[in-house]
Amino acid sequence: MLSWLARVIKGIVIALGFILPGISGGVLAAILGIYERMIGFLAHPFKDFKENVLYFIPVAIGMLLGIGLFSYPIEYLLENYQVFVLWSFAGAIIGTVPSLLKESTRESDRDKIDLAWLWTTFIISGLGLYALNFVVGTLSASFLNFVLAGALLALGVLVPGLSPSNLLLILGLYAPMLTGFKTFDLLGTFFPIGIGAGATLIVFSKLMDYALNNYHSRVYHLIIGIVLSSTLLILIPNAGNAESIQYTGLSLVGYVIIAFFFALGIWLGIWMSQLEDKYK
C-alpha cells in the first residue's frame, strides 16, 4: 500500500513538469527513479505488460490529480509572485543537477566528447529557445494547436531536461492550457492534448529507449545542457515574450527574498534527488 501511495505521489510530482515553466516531466521522472522503466514500457509495451500496467496505474492517477490540484494555485502564484516562484523553480532544478551528473557516468566515465556535447547543447538550445519567440510568434488556443501542445508535453517526458511549459509560454499556449486544466475542459483541452501526447509517445519512445541503451552518457550530457540553458532562460527577461520574468520595481528586500527562495529551491532539489536514491 505504501508503495502504491508513493507512486501516486510520484505522479503528482511529475504532473508539475506539465504545468511549471522551466520544469521537465522527464527530469522529474528521472529524479524519482521511474524514467527508464517508463521509456522501456513505452518502447516495448507487451514486455511484462501486466506488471508494468499495475506499476504505472497509480502514477497516472497521480498525474491527473496533480494537474487538477496545482493548475489554479500555480496560475495564481505566477500572476502575483512571478519572480519569486520562478527563482524557486530554478533553484529546485539546479539542486537536481548533481544527481543528473552522477547518473550520466553510471555506465561509463565522462570524457571530453561528453563535455563538448554538454556545452554545445547548452549554447545551441539556449540561443534557439531565446530566439523562438521572434521566429514563430504566438499561436491561438485551437484544437490543432493543443495537439501540438500535447506533443510538446510528451517530448518533455521523453527528453528529460526539455521544459514543455517554457515552449508553451513562448508559443502563447501556456495560459489557455492552464485555464483548460483548471476547469477540466475535457473536449477542448484534455482530448487534443491527449492525442498529441499519445502519438508522440508512440513514435519517439523506441528512439529514446535505443539512445539510452546505446548512448547513455551522451544522452544525459545532452539532457544536462538543456536543463542548464532552460533554467537560465526562465530567469532572463525576453522582449519577445510578454509572459517572461520581469524585475521592474523590485526592491533590495525583494532581491533578498529571491535569494532565499532560490536557496530553498536548491535544498528541495537536493532533497528530491536523495529521495530518488532511497526509494527508486
Please give the residue ranges for each predicted region.
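Multi-pass membrane proteins that catalyze or facilitate reactions on polyprenyl-/lipid-phosphate substrates
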Residues: 1-20, 24-280
